[in-house]
Amino acid sequence: MTSTLFFKPRPSSTLAEIAALTKAELVDPSQGDRVISGIASLDEAGPMHLGFFENIKYVAELEQTHAGACLVTQRYETRVPPHVAVLRVKSPVQAFVAYARHIHEDAMRPMSGFGGTGIAPSAVIHPSARLEDGVIVDPLAVIGPDVEIGAGSVIGAGAVIASGVKIGRDCNVGANTTIQFSLIGNNVLIHPGCHIGQDGFRFIFARTHQKVPQVGRVIIQNDVEIGSGTTVDRGGLRDTVIGEGTKIDNQVQVGHNVTIGRHCVIAAQCGLAGSLTLGDNVALGAKVGINNHVMIGDGAQITAMSAVKDSVPAGERWGGYFAKPTKQWFREIIAVERLMRGGAGAAPKADDGKDEDRG
């Protein structure tokens, strides 16, 4: 359940107010004045908490919960204990998130780790840097020459913003993050310990390894979120680009000249080699590695721990080592298991990776 030590929720809500906010139907309208003061998982919830149920795997938690109210689909509302108020809704998780965002705005984005409202005395800011009103700079942060930072942005403790970097409005740069050779849009969240804009890993071998100059930039568009420990190399001759609305998890490596489209999701510990391209709405599971110079088409999905050496067409699902269409990969796994058990049978036919029409 949520901790009031770190997160300060809004005042309590009635079930009628929650129903209106989440567009749910309160099955027993007579309970409309019943008060809820927080959110919790069903197994930890008490009489003042709101929970939600959507996955049949956790039906035992639903049947044993002590929650005061539960968001649930009509299909499962008969499994809700009598003491729990039922809020009927088409998508319980979406309704729950809507209410959570409403009462916990303080958890939506990092703020100053020191409760600061201005520039800390120990911060170092070059005289030529331009900070709009409302920028917060925590202790020991360093802001270099000709840096521009928009209103409402927060620069965490020990962060280093190098010469010429531009950061838009309502951004957050986490503690001990370094940013150089970068242009960053509005409402970008960069969590602690990230390194953005260092030179890419490019050498040629002529008796010794000779470094290739990296003279591009990093372009991060609006509404991007980058998790802790992620590194984004600047481009060599062209820019490294992260598209609008993309969300990147912790400890991801983005190589030089990479182009990531809009609204992609990249899970932890992925490695994106130089000069590859992700289209829009691409999803990568954890620990995916992608070869350089390949193209992952719009809407493609790659399963966790896959190694991708070839381009993936738009809309397809690939996985494995080396990655291939997932249904082909699964059939090959089954065939190998049968061989290990001494079974017989023809090898499965190849698959194009496209979902079959079930209509």
UniProtKB/Swiss-Prot annotation:
The enzyme's E.C. designation: 2.3.1.191
Entry annotation: catalytic residues: 256
Biological process, per Gene Ontology: lipid A biosynthetic process
Enzyme class of the recorded protein, top EC level: transferase
CC per GO annotation: membrane
Origin superkingdom: Bacteria
Keyword Flavoprotein: no
Chemical reaction(s) catalysed: a UDP-3-O-[(3R)-3-hydroxyacyl]-alpha-D-glucosamine + a (3R)-hydroxyacyl-[ACP] = a UDP-2-N,3-O-bis[(3R)-3-hydroxyacyl]-alpha-D-glucosamine + holo-[ACP] + H(+)
Keyword field: Acyltransferase, Lipid A biosynthesis, Lipid biosynthesis, Lipid metabolism, Repeat, Transferase
Function according to Swiss-Prot or TrEMBL: Catalyzes the N-acylation of UDP-3-O-acylglucosamine using 3-hydroxyacyl-ACP as the acyl donor. Is involved in the biosynthesis of lipid A, a phosphorylated glycolipid that anchors the lipopolysaccharide to the outer membrane of the cell.
Protein name per UniProt: UDP-3-O-acylglucosamine N-acyltransferase
Organism: Rhodopseudomonas palustris (strain HaA2)
Gene: lpxD
